[in-house]
Amino acid sequence: MNRQIIVNNTYGEKRIAILEDRKLVELHVMHSEEGNCLSNIYSGIIRRVLPGMQSAFVEFGGTRTGFIHANDLKLNITYEEYQKNLESDDDEDAGSEDQSQETQSEPRKHTDITEYAKEGNRILVQVVKEPIGQKGAKLTTHISLAGRYCVLLPTITHIGVSRRINDREKRDELKEFGQKVLKKGYGIILRTLAAETDIKTIEKEVVFLIKKWISIQNTFQKGRGTALIEPALDPMLDFVQNTAMNELSEIVVDNKNDEKAVRDYFAFYGENPDDKVKFYDLPYPIFDYYSIEPEVTKLVKKKIWLKSGGFLIIEQTEALTVIDVNTGKFVGKGDLESTVVKTNCEAAEEIAYHLRLRNLAGIIVVDFIDMRNQANKKKVIAKLEHELEKDPAKCTVFYFTRLGLIQITRKRTTESNISSLTEPCPYCSGNGIIRSRETVTFQIFREIKKHVKLYGSRVLTVQAHPETIFALEQKYSGEFEKLKKELRISVKTESDNSLHRESFSVEGK
């Protein structure tokens, strides 16, 4: 697999596109006025303790307070507890890199928030989940510092080695190195890329991360109030950090500062970036040149056509995402069950692709086309799970419910691309629908009757949108005339293009 990272930086908006074998698989959009707070480390102040919820609200410098659970304040926790804390939010599975457990598990103990949190206390926190919708950022006091080859855990005693490292000898070598780090009082997770380098290089990174941690502590101790202590790695560099060099074919940027940042990053690890890093200065916009812009435009569409002629409908709500699978134009050449299975398998591949591309997370419910054969159901599940393995975020698939629905959970850390690229429609206030002309017309009829009965009006004026006036005077002219005759009134109508389709006024004399 060849991976390309294409970065478009334009006056306050940075867009990062990840292409695998020239196909867009991820898009990340950041706006300078909003900022990207995921993994940032802050000096925070506890503003409100909620014993009933075993949690607290923390002011940390964001636009609203963050949320921290008692277990994220607790001292001397095990790695298992740390993982459970990450997994506990919204009943979603954690999306961290797979790694083996090298320490013994301990039962999770009950934690009393009042033992660790007092209003006004200043604490060092890290954002583990960005604000999404009405929810504030999720915070923890258990800081993790990620590098290219390892993750340093300053507050947790743990050695972990990525499960993706299969070489037994290499695993033993990395665990032995981890023991040395553990003796210094730090936990460590050796990442997948650690298998591709030597211990000396990993040791250099560990020394760098320990120095960073000491600097963070010193800055926190000297400071007062809320403040950003340590910004997270630029998302652009984060993607570089998580990509093996033999898989990264190129990183193309259209901003000189971004080019310097990438070159400096490679230089730190002693790697020559000349054949990987490219500065784009052609007249065409960079996303147009790489055929990314048309794909970005499609991201907000609900309907996705499958190659066979079937289609998906993706509906994102506050609570969950619903995906409906339909055969559409596809009629197949065999029996109905074969047609359905083929459409469902094709849909499974496309669903996994769009969960990652659109960054849809939390609870996802899929309504596949009904299948009678259990073997066919297992085939579709297997296809879905296989395709989801390509996703860096942790996904869990649950078998068909009694209603024939598939449930998926995908770890959420940032908002979806639909949320990043769109805003609620100002015309319908985000409902996606407005009252029909017919409904508004009959509302006007009722309002006219009310005016006559309450105020004794005999001459009235109705102001409304032109389409509503058309419905009054044309489509329902008979009913309108009957109403005027019955009430013995005269009604003047006035069209106003500036009015909302649902708005109208009735005034009487």
Where are these predicted regions, by residue range?
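Conserved glycine-centered short motifs in functionally critical loops
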Residues: M53-A56, F60, R64, E130-L153, ...
